[in-house]
Regions:
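Membrane-interface extramembranous regions
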Residues: 2-162
């Protein structure tokens, strides 16, 4: 364990490592949310269900976009710019996951856009699981990034008098 920590850059702290792990797990989770919606759209023929089919397709596309951004090396643009992009992508992913989760739970008890789910088949269980994992992992990532930025000293732009 000590050798792994020694291999990390000196400024890397355990919370930063936890943040990166949460980021990558969250990225995989939101991509899996998209995969479930794509399978349901194409394989289970939800494409023919008005409104719901369109929402499944949008969830698939949106999940793919934010998941890809979360996996991309955007911190090469600079630490602050990279963190901003990653936090915005994480918040987008959380929005997709929470929206999907809420919609699924509502449609279990009452019609949503004229459609009502019944029972907990595998696709529903997987969607619930991946929505929850996305929310937890990326919520943790956002909190860690916010905490790390709050702990940094402010950047000053004052020029020294010559």
């Amino acid at each position: 364990m000590a050798s792994v920590l020694q291999a990390l850059p000196a400024r890397t702290r355990p919370t930063e490592v936890a943040g990166e792990v949460a980021r990558y797990f969250g990225a995989v989770s939101i991509l899996l949310v998209g995969a479930v919606h794509a399978q349901q759209y194409y394989g289970a023929y939800f494409s023919v269900v008005p409104t719901i089919g369109t929402l499944f397709l949008l969830s698939f596309v949106g999940s793919g976009v934010v998941g890809t951004v979360l996996l991309a090396p955007v911190r090469r643009l600079g630490r602050n710019a990279g963190d901003l992009i990653l936090v915005l992508a994480a918040l987008g992913a959380i929005g997709i996951a929470v929206g999907s989760l809420a919609s699924l739970l509502v449609s279990e008890y009452m019609p949503l856009f004229g459609f009502m789910e019944s029972g907990y088949r595998l696709a529903i269980v997987l969607a619930l699981l991946f929505d929850a994992l996305t929310t937890v992992f990326l919520g943790l990532f956002v909190l860690i990034v916010a905490r790390n930025h709050a702990a940094q000293p402010p950047i000053t732009t004052e020029r020294k008098a010559r």
